[in-house]
Amino acid sequence: MKSNRDSYWMKIALKYAYYAEENGEVPIGAILVFQEKIIGTGWNSVISQNDSTAHAEIIALREAGRNIKNYRLVNTTLYVTLQPCMMCCGAIINSRIKRLVFGASYKDLKKNPFLKKIFINLEKNKLKIKKHIMRNECAKILSNFFKNKRF
């Protein structure tokens, strides 16, 4: 059953989110899967890399591209613990990823107005999307992280 596999892969993405948190980053993790194998992994690394584009999704896509020697990541599924931002959505679409599975949505983060503004409507593209796999767990790590930060 696909839902069980989605949970399996999301648990791995969550491990990368926890790693990001342990390193003082916003806790977001991502993995890219092709034919039941992980071809790319990433965790948010904006602070440590001094790079505003070092989002978990972007890092996973870059690694996958290097691994398969192609930027076209067709027939892959991206698992990410938070609904992708506008920048990451563009990369997902340009990479030709077939399927996106995310855990928490911006709504889960208490309707943060900043986050709400940067989401793009992915449903208008050919990307198949499955939402809210392990939603509570994915939202919890982010909510706890932001409780301890002052913005």
UniProtKB/Swiss-Prot annotation:
Cysteine pairings via disulfide bonds: none
Highest rank taxon of the organism: Bacteria
GO molecular function, one term: zinc ion binding
Binding site for Zn(2+): H55, C85, C88
InterPro entries, per database record: APOBEC/CMP_deaminase_Zn-bd, CMP_dCMP_dom, Cytidine_deaminase-like, tRNA_aden_deaminase
Keywords: Hydrolase, Metal-binding, tRNA processing, Zinc
Keyword Methyltransferase: no
Active-site feature positions: E57
UniProt record, GO biological process: tRNA wobble adenosine to inosine editing
Cofactor annotation: Zn(2+)
Segments forming domain CMP/dCMP-type deaminase: 4-122
Reactions that this protein is recorded to catalyse: adenosine(34) in tRNA + H2O + H(+) = inosine(34) in tRNA + NH4(+)
Function: Catalyzes the deamination of adenosine to inosine at the wobble position 34 of tRNA(Arg2).
Subunit description: Homodimer.
NCBIfam families the record matches: PRK10860.1
Assigned protein family: Belongs to the cytidine and deoxycytidylate deaminase family.
Protein name per the record: tRNA-specific adenosine deaminase
